[in-house]
Amino acid sequence: MSRIEAVFFDCDGTLVDSEVICSRAYVTMFQEFGITLDPEEVFKRFKGVKLYEIIDIVSLEHGVTLAKTEAEHVYRAEVARLFDSELEAIEGAGALLSAITAPMCVVSNGPNNKMQHSMGKLNMLHYFPDKLFSGYDIQRWKPDPALMFHAAKAMNVNVENCILVDDSVAGAQSGIDAGMEVFYFCADPHNKPIVHPKVTTFTHLSQLPELWKARGWDITA
């Protein structure tokens, strides 16, 4: 690929340090329904997995049927509370975003209002004017590549000429299946390794400009 048309970012765990917060909110949600889970185990198992799928898995394992909309309300309220009090940016996110000269967007399995909340709190929204794309917009979520195609169409770019930066296996798979160059963020030692010709693994956002330059992509100032 000689020219990069756009850079796609995941949100949670890639730009905003929210994965542990979200795991704690899952634990709180299930506690409301009498199910006790270990926060670290939740973090390891469900990174990048959409909410209703997590509810289905845990419900099946515990032999219960949960009202998903009621459970979601508990979860969203707890996430909002924790975001307001504890949320921080991933180290290096601000510097990277300010250096990128190519068009950018965010592609997340989370709802748009969650992205608005987290990225607004961390002063990142101005990097992505009207460029927040959620699986909820099209009712299809990573690892399905549909979200990548949806975002590329809205951005008026060729998806195969775009980069995806994501910290989850599900996200990386969506990028692979869309034909993108995937930069797999593995700062978390719990991340499963991915070996694929379309995937480059890295451990800190500050590494990306040099990795891109090494590929001949001049997309940072």
From Swiss-Prot:
Query: What does the entry say about activity and pH?
Result: Optimum pH is between 6 and 7.5.
This entry's Enzyme Commission designation comes to 3.1.3.-
Transcription is among the record's keywords:
no
The entry's free-text remark on the cofactor is: Magnesium. Can also use other divalent metal cations as manganese, cobalt or zinc.
Q: Could you say which residues form the signal peptide?
A: none
Q: Which residues bind Mg(2+)?
A: D10, D12, D167
Q: Which GO terms describe its molecular function?
A: magnesium ion binding; manganese ion binding; phosphatase activity
The UniProt keyword set, sorted, is: Hydrolase, Magnesium, Manganese, Metal-binding
Active site (UniProt)? D10
Q: Which family does it belong to?
A: Belongs to the HAD-like hydrolase superfamily. CbbY/CbbZ/Gph/YieH family.
What is the stated purpose of this protein?
A: Catalyzes strongly the dephosphorylation of 6-phosphogluconate (6P-Glu) and slightly the dephosphorylation of dihydroxyacetone phosphate (DHAP) and phosphoenolpyruvate (PEP). Also hydrolyzes both purines (GMP and IMP) and pyrimidines as secondary substrates.
Would you tell me the protein name for this molecule? 6-phosphogluconate phosphatase
Which source organism?
Answer: Escherichia coli (strain K12)
